[in-house]
Amino acid sequence: MPKFGTRSKEQLATCHIDLQVLFNTVIEEIDCSVVCGHRNEEDQEKAFNSGNSKAHYPEGKHNSNPSTAVDVYPYPIDFNDNERYFWFAGWVLAKAKILRNVGEITNKVRWGGNWDGLKNGVIDFSYNRSPKVLNDLPHFELIQ
């Protein structure tokens, strides 16, 4: 069974309890790494200036304390393997729905690769979107 390393545990501990419960459940079956939980002002502005965020501090979901957003990468990490991210996101979102249905978490979860939600009952994985839409494949956030 995979386990989180020290850095992943530290990052996840900065997140809302729903994200902690969700990803502590996910790691039992899928190896992954938590790269970012809470972002302070300096880290958020770096993310914005590098194009990794559309939000200035304190507007990002990573900026709340505890954070209502988390960036998690499936192993092995391959930034060019979109299929792996889609598969991982499907797993995470399915686990989130199950945990919410049984009352272990209270919030819905949105994935950063699908800001537009379901269209005709299908997740839109196309990359033919407006350039204003950030495809943030490792990003998961709570819908409160």
Which residues make up each language-model segment?
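Active-site acidic/histidine clusters and adjacent loop/turn architecture
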Residues: 1-33
